[in-house]
Each structure stands twice: as C-alpha cells, then as structure tokens.
Swiss-Prot record:
It comes from Trimeresurus stejnegeri. Keywords: Blood coagulation cascade inhibiting toxin, Calcium, Disulfide bond, Hemostasis impairing toxin, Metal-binding, Secreted, Signal, Toxin. Calcium is required for ligand binding. Its main location: secreted. Residues 32-151 form the C-type lectin domain. Belongs to the snaclec family. Anticoagulant protein which binds to the gamma-carboxyglutamic acid-domain regions of factors IX (F9) and factor X (F10) in the presence of calcium with a 1 to 1 stoichiometry. GO terms for molecular function: metal ion binding; toxin activity. This is Snaclec coagulation factor IX/factor X-binding protein subunit A. Heterodimer of subunits A and B; disulfide-linked. Residues 1-23 form the signal peptide. It holds the Pfam family Lectin_C.
Length: 152
C-alpha cells in the first residue's frame, strides 16, 4: 500500500511539473511560450487557411507573430516540419477592405506589436518568404493557395 501511494504521488508531481510546458498541446503540435503551433502542408487561400485553423482546434487561428523570438520559432517549425519548402507560408495578418495600411489586429484579435516587413512591401494578405528563411513578411494575393501555420 505504501509503495502504491509513493508511486501515485510521484506521478502527480510529474503531471504537475509538465503542466503548461507543452504537454497540453495536441499530438503533432509544438509549444512556445504557452501557445501551440503546427505547420500544415495543405494548399489553401488565406481565408480558407484561417477557417481551417479555427475549425481544427479550439481557439485556433493563423499564427500571430508578436516577437523576434516567436518569429525564429515559427521559421524553425516550418523548416523542420515541411517536407517541401514552398516559397511562401500564410500568417494571420491581412488588410481588410480597401485600406492601404496594415490592419491593426491579427486574425486572433491580438494587436500588432511586432513587425518584420520586407522593405517596400505593401500590406494585403501576409506570408513568410522562403528567401528570408521564413523570417520576413511579404504581401501576397489573398487567393493564392499556399501552406500555413496555425496557432492555438
């Protein structure tokens, strides 16, 4: 009986220590600073990719890149998890309507506090470009079908 209590307590300690470390991400997803991420090698328009992320996991959206550390994490995630490295990958930022400037929110509703544009780019639907090792943002035609990264 004493051994059972000791083992049960040990398992409880391990479970508590894993809480919030990525253990609560779905299988196949990666954790970074309390969020879960997955690169999808499916070819979808920006809008279809956003819908896919929202329907696939509770609280899911196209990735919102809010720091250089997160940008590096996402770039590494793409490079390590996609068999075919396409030229572009969707992120969760686009301009609504006829505006000429960046929408002030990501698709998940968070504010744009970090920017990493390729110089001279106008701002419509945004993706990451392979030539920059998926670290810089580039504007793209929103109807283009390319891979994407979801965040939850």
């Amino acid at each position: 009986m004493g051994r059972f209590i000791f083992v049960s307590f040990g398992l409880l300690v391990v479970a508590a220590s894993l809480s919030g470390t990525g253990a609560d991400c779905l299988s196949g997803w990666s954790s970074y600073e309390g969020h879960c991420y997955k690169a999808f090698e499916l070819y979808k328009t920006w809008e279809d990719a956003e819908s896919f992320c929202m329907e696939g996991v509770k609280g899911g959206h196209l990735v919102s890149i809010e720091s250089s550390g997160e940008a590096d994490f996402v770039a590494q995630l793409i490079s390590e998890n996609m068999k075919r490295l396409d030229f572009f990958v969707w992120i969760g930022l686009r301009v609504q309507g006829d505006e000429k400037q960046c929408n002030s929110e990501w698709s998940d509703g968070s504010s744009v506090s970090y920017e990493n544009w390729i110089e001279s780019e106008s701002k419509t639907c945004l993706g990451l470009e392979q030539q920059t090792k998926f670290r810089k943002w580039v504007n793209l035609y929103c109807g283009q079908r390319i891979p994407f990264v979801c965040e939850a």
